[in-house]
Amino acid sequence: MEGSRLRLRGVEAGDLAALGAIRAEPGVREWWGDPQPDDLVAPDDGDLLVIDVNGAVAGAIQYEEVTDPQYRSAGIDLFLGESWQGRGLGREAVGVLVRHLIESRGHHRLTIDPAVANERAIRCYEAVGFARVGVMRQYERAADGSWHDGLLMELLADTWRA
């Protein structure tokens, strides 16, 4: 999948060290927790794609599909290395994946669930067209062991701006 500045592609063996290093960066670890060895090889929730910028691993984006025809939805999540943040690459990566999931995979509803305190991520998702649905209290355990709230956000295919 191609964007104007990036490509989303499958994970290759040579990507694992770079992805592991990104997951260990303080600004990524804050929201994703400590990297687990199998997270990058076999994520437990869907397909993992590398965010590739001119051959460099900038981060990863993953999605999990609900293929039941009564639902046709998918959840998305991503992480971007600290040195790649603030350039609109997260927004572009989410937009590329949204287009694929709606136009190629036929999903009618997409969700994402950033931490309520992750304002940068929330702005990114809103810029793509995700809307706030509600707060999920004590949704996820933070790296320091405390619980934090998550924000459920959704994007519906019929309201998406292509």
Residue ranges of predicted features:
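Conserved active-site tyrosine of GNAT-family acetyltransferases
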Residues: 125, 130, 153
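Conserved N-terminal entry element of GNAT/NAT acetyltransferase domains
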Residues: 1-14, 30, 151, 155-162
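Short glycine/proline-centered loop/turn elements that form peptide/ligand docking sites
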Residues: 90, 94, 118-121, 138-143
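Short hydrophobic/aromatic beta-strand or adjacent loop that forms the aromatic wall/cage
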Residues: 46, 148-152
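Acetyl-CoA-dependent GNAT
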Residues: 10, 30-85, 91, 100, ...
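Hydrophobic pocket/interface hotspot
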Residues: 18-19, 76
